[in-house]
Amino acid sequence: MKQWPPWWAWELEFSPHLLKRMEDRRFTEVDLRRMLEHATGYRPDVAPGRWVVSARHRRRGWEVIVEPLPAEKLLLVITAYPVDASRT
């Protein structure tokens, strides 16, 4: 069983960038929450303090970029994209 960090259980906060990408990439908050619920792993992102979460959606691999906000105990979701798409 995968060990998740403490911030994994924090409430989600969505960035304005994510909200735009949800529309562009045709996925919903429910889709995103499902991706995170069934995520298979995580690794540090190139941006300090951020993490890349590996997930699946519509039978494709996706990456969800998150940033824990310890002071607020929130997990800020920065963006989400299919792994074969460029990150914008």
Region spans (language model):
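Ribonuclease/tRNase effector modules and their secretory precursors
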Residues: M1-T88
